[in-house]
């Protein structure tokens, strides 16, 4: 059990303890050119709604969204996922194959149309035990998309691609009066059409579309809990274990940077693929048959590939370090893989990115702020607090990697905030200041 540690310890950005933090002349002027900077500036200036149609820069992703829309139009409706604290849906194509997971903003735990009765009771009768005080309410869909941005920028390739889109489907949770009004209009038109073919009284309106995160669905993965139990009973070959360790370290990097408050061993997935041992085996079977299922561990075949999928990233990007009842620890810190220092391969991949404060600010922080600015309840002050936590996490991660620490040692480092403040002695230029978090939660173990 922890307690308050005392006053903030504040250091200037030019001190030796913060070597990678540099002064910024103007918050809207990049240190280095960035293709995203102009877009970010325009999104803050005009605040135009981007949700009229689903357009993304990735043509393959956009085509999957179109598949989902065609399927819904043809009656293949998204299916609500029973587990979880919010309304989330398996989205299928016209053939009935699951292609994504959609999580509407207005069906999140604190939202008006959350369909889970257990959460409604908890929210209304036991509010003191509900939610996470360090997170911004009803922004889980942005957190999902933000994790995908961090994953892409750092080239981790462990988060299934996620964007914010709009979808409309009758299987989503709408208000009773809205459904009743639409049903009454339809039935009235049907009655009129039976007596006067081709005539109708009402122009039918679609149910309003819902904005939310759409994450691509991944096949042939199993839960990390099941996978870890399997490899404890039947250890992996050395090469496969090295692959798993590197993938695990990528998960650590992602979760630590975004300060994921909900990473347990049942919301990250593992795919274990046994590749064909020779060309003949590969030619004889189709693609599906040439890769074995992930549920079977083959300790005798060294020709394997292990992949991790980090799903359920909706409870991340806090605006402060947890400092009340719960600490929301990373559950992977209890695994033996967390006791191994970061590998040279991961350090050589990640350190050049996170040691460059220009990259951190313009390729990570600005992109996250541009995403969060799309929300109708956007608060620049609150987002800046979220980014202060993220920059502090990045600073801790960089120092831990340089010092040869392990993920377990990383999570025991004191919480840090790196704030962007205006220096009046330097004609209003922006600089970064580091300070340690001075409040800790009552319970550190859950």
Locate each region found by the language model.
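C-terminal catalytic region of ATP-dependent kinase domains
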Residues: 3-20, 24-27, 31, 39-44, ...
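Alpha-helical interaction elements in eukaryotic regulators
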Residues: 60-64, 143-147, 164, 214, ...
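Conserved ATP-binding subdomain of kinase catalytic cores across diverse folds
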Residues: 1, 59-239, 244, 256-260, ...
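Cytosolic, low-complexity regulatory segments enriched in Ser/Pro/Gly with interspersed Lys/Arg
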Residues: 1-66, 70-75, 116, 123-126
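Active-site-proximal segment of zinc-dependent metalloprotease catalytic domains
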Residues: 236, 250-251
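Residue immediately N-terminal to the catalytic "proton-acceptor" Asp
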Residues: 261, 266
């Amino acid at each position: 059990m922890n307690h308050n540690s005392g006053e903030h310890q504040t250091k200037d950005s030019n001190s030796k303890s913060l070597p990678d933090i540099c002064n910024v002349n103007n918050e809207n002027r990049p240190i280095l050119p960035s293709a995203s900077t102009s877009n970010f500036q325009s999104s803050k200036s005009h605040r135009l709604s981007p949700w009229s149609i689903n357009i993304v820069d990735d043509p393959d992703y956009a085509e999957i969204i179109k598949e989902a829309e065609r399927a819904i139009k043809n009656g293949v409706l998204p299916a609500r996922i029973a587990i979880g604290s919010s309304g989330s849906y398996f989205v299928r194509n016209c053939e009935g194959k699951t292609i994504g997971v959609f999580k509407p903003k207005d069906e999140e735990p604190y939202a008006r149309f959350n369909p889970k009765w257990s959460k409604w009771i908890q929210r209304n009768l036991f509010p003191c035990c509900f939610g996470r005080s360090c997170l911004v309410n009803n922004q889980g869909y942005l957190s999902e998309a933000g994790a995908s941005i961090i994953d892409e920028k750092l080239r981790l390739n462990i988060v299934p691609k996620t964007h914010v889109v709009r979808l409309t489907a009758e299987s989503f949770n709408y208000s009773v009066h809205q459904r009743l009004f639409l049903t009454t209009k339809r039935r009235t038109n049907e009655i009129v059409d039976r007596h006067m073919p081709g005539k109708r009284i009402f122009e039918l309106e679609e149910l309003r579309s819902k904005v939310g995160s759409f994450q691509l669905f991944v096949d042939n993965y199993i839960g990390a809990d099941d996978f870890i139990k399997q490899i404890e009973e039947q250890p992996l070959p050395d090469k496969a274990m090295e692959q798993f360790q590197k993938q695990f370290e990528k998960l650590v990097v992602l979760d630590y940077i975004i300060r994921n408050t909900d990473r347990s061993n049942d919301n990250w997935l593992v795919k274990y693929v046994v590749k064909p041992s020779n060309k003949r085996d590969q030619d004889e079977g189709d693609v599906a048959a040439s890769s074995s299922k992930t549920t079977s561990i083959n300790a005798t075949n060294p020709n394997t590939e292990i992949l991790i999928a980090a799903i359920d990233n909706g409870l991340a990007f806090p605006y402060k370090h947890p400092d009340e009842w719960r600490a929301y620890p990373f559950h992977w810190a209890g695994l033996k893989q967390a006791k191994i220092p970061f590998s040279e391969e991961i350090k050589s991949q990640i350190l050049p990115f996170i040691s460059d404060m220009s990259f951190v600010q313009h390729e990570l922080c600005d992109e996250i702020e541009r995403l969060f600015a799309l929300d109708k309840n956007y608060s620049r002050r609150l987002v800046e607090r979220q980014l202060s936590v993220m920059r502090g996490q990045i600073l801790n991660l960089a120092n831990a990697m340089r010092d040869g620490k392990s993920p377990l040692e990383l999570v025991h480092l004191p919480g840090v905030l790196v704030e962007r403040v205006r220096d009046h002695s330097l004609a209003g230029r922006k600089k970064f200041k580091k300070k340690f978090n001075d409040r800790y939660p009552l319970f550190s173990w859950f």
